[in-house]
A protein has these predicted regions:
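Asp-box/WD-like beta-propeller blade repeats and closely related beta-sheet repeat scaffolds
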Residues: 111-150
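Short loop/turn motifs that cap or connect beta-strands within the blades
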Residues: 67-71, 131-137, 318-323
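Beta-strand-rich domains and repeat architectures in extracellular enzymes and scaffolds
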Residues: 19-52
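Predominantly a core beta-strand signature of beta-propeller blades
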Residues: 16-18, 61-64, 127-130, 156, ...
Length: 446
């Protein structure tokens, strides 16, 4: 465990943080390949860098330049301000491995949004690209085309900001700004879109940076930045109006009274963390665009527990928080092999604005300490437990000490009061758990 990194980032109890990559130039979003191989030289994930590069990272954590100089204008590194836009959204087409990326470009002195599809022969270097959609007005100061995702229906969903200058366009059905767009992979309009011959899936958004699909309800969730308040999370449904510019709370399931710079989000839904975190939502709060030190505004990752139908938040906890003194902030997040990964846009560069110092960090569960026997808290093990619905299941699966299987009298479990023999447990022999707890005698018998 790297003590220096833990001085910079506080993490939720039971987890650790590791720096996987450093020296990236303003890394924004990251996306993992669908089924990574075990070969060191094969691609594991891709990362967009704000000022026009895409990096491919292989299983051995070497960094390769997949594409570079995709912007046709010179960015100015102004944070906050006109340096906040560029190349942001990233999505991998699972069958072909092609990348969809969103960015702004300059044409006749005006900034516009475009969506590109890039192709590669080996996954390490782009060999061709095509424009899927373009000509959507934008500016250099954020509120551009942001995250891209592919739904369970195989369609492409694209977050488009309102362009900042005229927020009323978010309500204009003839303008693609301030919308979530739905399209076929070639950019054409699906026949079953809410409005015939229109790419608009939902409207009323301001600066919808992040997007993720939840398996349990097969719905799209987005993160949308408010003006100086009401940064929100919303479950996006076909044909709905999400209120902006009149309100950021319309059809939202969560909003923050103060602006937190909400960016990316992802659900824990593939057993990257212990089962107790299943279906929880993890949201990056970036904070100020170049804010030094911990601050009270953002610079953390929040975990939220949603209700089953995605209409409300049942719990809210800080999961990761920056505690250093520089401008580091979490930006993109994604679950991948063995944990949650996030990009740190600025890193620890202490005011050197042009220095490539961005990082990728990994948060993983501390499953086992030396000398400790642990029963992994997975859905499979929980389903095999001798006491379905046991109130001590979390303790049984998480806190294994001295060969004891049970939670040692911390609740009113009747089996514990009697002394629960691990030999009776259907998973006990698998993990060599042989102890029993005899509460009456107050001693352990092996």
């Amino acid at each position: 465990m790297d003590e220096e990194i833990h001085k910079l980032w506080w993490v939720f109890p039971g987890f650790k943080i590791e720096k996987m990559i450093t020296g990236l130039d303003l890394p924004v979003n990251l996306a993992f390949v669908k089924e990574p191989t075990s070969k060191p030289e094969d691609v594991l994930l891709y990362v967009t860098e704000l000022y026009g590069n895409i990096k491919a990272i292989t299983n051995d954590w070497k960094v390769h330049t997949y594409a570079e100089n995709l912007l046709n204008y010179e960015p100015n590194y102004e944070f906050p301000g006109t340096g906040e836009s560029g190349l942001t959204g990233l999505c991998i087409e699972p069958e072909s491995g092609d990348l969809f990326v969103s960015m702004i470009y300059e044409e006749d002195g005006e900034m516009k949004n475009q969506l590109l599809r890039t192709k590669s022969k080996d996954g390490l270097k782009m060999h061709s690209k095509e424009t899927i959609i373009k000509d959507i007005p934008s500016i250099k100061a954020a509120h551009q085309m942001q995250e891209i995702s592919i739904g369970f229906d195989g369609k492409l969903y694209v977050n488009v900001g309102d362009g900042m200058i005229k927020p009323e366009v978010a309500q204009d059905d003839d303008d693609l700004r301030g919308k979530i767009l739905r399209m076929n992979l070639d950019g054409s309009v699906p026949e079953d879109n809410p409005k015939k011959d229109s790419l608009i899936f939902a409207k009323g958004f301001r600066n919808p940076f992040g997007a993720i699909w939840r398996k349990s309800d097969e719905s799209l969730y987005i993160a949308d930045n408010g003006p100086a308040y009401d940064d929100r999370v919303a479950r996006v449904q076909a044909g709905e109006n999400y209120g902006w510019p009149e309100s950021m709370r319309t059809n939202s399931i969560f909003w923050h009274n103060l602006s937190q710079g909400i960016t990316a989000l992802d659900f824990m839904q593939n057993e990257e963390f212990p089962y107790e975190f299943d279906d929880e939502l993890f949201v990056a709060f970036f904070g100020g665009s170049y804010q030094k030190g911990p601050g009270i505004k953002g610079k953390n990752i929040i975990k939220m527990k949603l209700n089953k139908d995605g209409t409300a938040i049942n719990s809210y906890d800080i999961f990761v928080k920056y505690t250093g003194e520089n401008a580091a902030s979490p930006c993109g997040i994604a679950f991948g092999p063995g944990g949650l990964y996030f990009t740190d846009l600025h890193g620890e560069k202490d005011g050197q604005m042009h220095k490539a110092a961005g990082n990728i960090y990994k948060i993983s569960s501390v499953v086992k300490e030396e000398g400790e026997i642990i029963v992994p808290y997975t859905k499979e093990n929980a389903d095999r437990c001798i006491c379905p619905g046991c109130p001590t299941i979390n303790e049984c699966m998480k806190n294994r000490n001295e060969h004891l299987f049970c939670a040692r009298g911390k609740t009113d479990c009747e089996m514990e009061k009697k002394g629960c023999l691990c030999g009776e447990c259907p998973i006990g022999s698998e993990y060599n758990l042989r102890g029993l707890l005899n509460r009456e005698k107050g001693k352990k018998i092996i």
